[in-house]
């Protein structure tokens, strides 16, 4: 008759609560970053910081494009197949 909990049921419950995988130093180091996941703070938060990084990345891409297009000339930076082959 199944009228009570057995030790196997208790152990399976405790096994389900344990985290799967291996505990690594990197995982332990990154755990505080994941503890805030799912929480939304009121206000703009880090939106301004994200905007600054997007603008800096756009400037970086623009500089790379100008170097490739030879619009921005730098000393010792040439874009020809002959110099790449040697």
Curated annotation (Swiss-Prot):
GO terms for biological process: photosynthesis; protein stabilization. It is found in: Plastid, Chloroplast thylakoid membrane. It holds the Pfam family PsbH. GO terms for cellular component: chloroplast thylakoid membrane; photosystem II. The chain crosses the membrane at residues 48-68. Keywords: Chloroplast, Membrane, Phosphoprotein, Photosynthesis, Photosystem II, Plastid, Thylakoid, Transmembrane, Transmembrane helix. One of its GO terms (molecular function) is phosphate ion binding. Phosphorylation is a light-dependent reaction catalyzed by a membrane-bound kinase; phosphorylation occurs on Thr residue(s) in the N-terminus of the protein. It is a single-pass membrane protein. The keyword Transmembrane helix applies. The modification Phosphothreonine is found at residue 3. Signal peptide: none annotated. Its main location: plastid. The keyword Chaperone does not apply. PANTHER family: PHOTOSYSTEM II REACTION CENTER PROTEIN H (PTHR34469:SF4). One of the components of the core complex of photosystem II (PSII), required for its stability and/or assembly. PSII is a light-driven water:plastoquinone oxidoreductase that uses light energy to abstract electrons from H(2)O, generating O(2) and a proton gradient subsequently used for ATP formation. It consists of a core antenna complex that captures photons, and an electron transfer chain that converts photonic excitation into a charge separation. Belongs to the PsbH family. PSII is composed of 1 copy each of membrane proteins PsbA, PsbB, PsbC, PsbD, PsbE, PsbF, PsbH, PsbI, PsbJ, PsbK, PsbL, PsbM, PsbT, PsbX, PsbY, PsbZ, Psb30/Ycf12, at least 3 peripheral proteins of the oxygen-evolving complex and a large number of cofactors. It forms dimeric complexes. This is Photosystem II reaction center protein H. The lineage of its organism: Eukaryota, Viridiplantae, Chlorophyta, core chlorophytes, Chlorophyceae.
């Amino acid at each position: 008759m199944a009228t009570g909990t057995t030790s196997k049921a208790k152990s399976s419950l405790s096994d389900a609560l344990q985290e799967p995988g291996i505990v690594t130093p990197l995982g332990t180091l990154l755990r505080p970053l994941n503890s805030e996941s799912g929480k939304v703070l009121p206000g703009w938060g880090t939106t301004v910081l994200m905007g600054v990084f997007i603008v800096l990345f756009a400037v970086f891409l623009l500089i790379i494009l100008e170097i490739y297009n030879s619009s921005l000339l730098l000393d010792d930076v040439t874009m020809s197949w002959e110099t790449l082959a040697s």
